[in-house]
Amino acid sequence: MATDSALINLTHHFLIAMPGLEDEAFAKSVVYMCEHSDRGALGLVINKPSDINLKNLFDKVELPLRRDDLTEAPVFQGGPVQTERGFVLHESMMPGSESVYASTMTIPGGLEMTTSKDVLEALSTGAGPRKVFVSLGYSAWGEGQLESEISDNSWLTVPADVAVIFDTPVEQRYDKALMLLGLQSWMLSPDAGHA
C-alpha cells in the first residue's frame, strides 16, 4: 500500500485531536510522536493523567523515590496499547551519544523514551534525567492509518515544543499545543474540512 508517509515525518511532533475525532479515548488529546515511519507510528498522550502518581508507581515496583519534585507528579495514560507497561519520556542524558539506559529509543529534539526499569532505578536514587514524563501504555497506528486519520481531519500536527510536555500544567497542554499553530480551541469546529 503506497502512502504519503514518505513525504512527511511526524516524529517529534504533536498530534492535536480535532473536536470531531470519533475515538473517545483520544478526545481533546495531545499526542507526542516518538516515532513515525512508513511502517506506522508510536506516540504518548501527554495530557491525560491517570489516578496514580509517581510515588504510587515507585511503591508498586518496590523502589524508593528520593526526588521530592516527582512524588506527586502524575503517571499518564499514554494510550490504549500495553496499558500495564511503563514508558518514560525524558531528556537525553548525554545528547549525541548512546543512551545510558538498556531499552531506549532516541528521538530528535534531545529526548529519549525508555522502557527498561533502569531509568526508574536511576530516578529512585536521585540520579537520572531531570525532566521526565511517565506513562502507562502508548498510542500506535499501523501503516497508513495515521495519514488516513489526518486526511479525515481527525488531527492537527505541529512540531513539538518540549516545554509543553515538561513545563506546562496538564490542564493547559491542549491549549498550549494549539497556540503553537496560532489557534485557540474556540476556533475549531467538529465539521472542519468536510463538505
UniProtKB/Swiss-Prot annotation:
Disulfide bonds: none annotated. It comes from the Bacteria. One of its GO terms (cellular component) is cytosol. NCBIfam families: PRK00228.1-1. Belongs to the UPF0301 (AlgH) family. This is UPF0301 protein Bpro_1142.
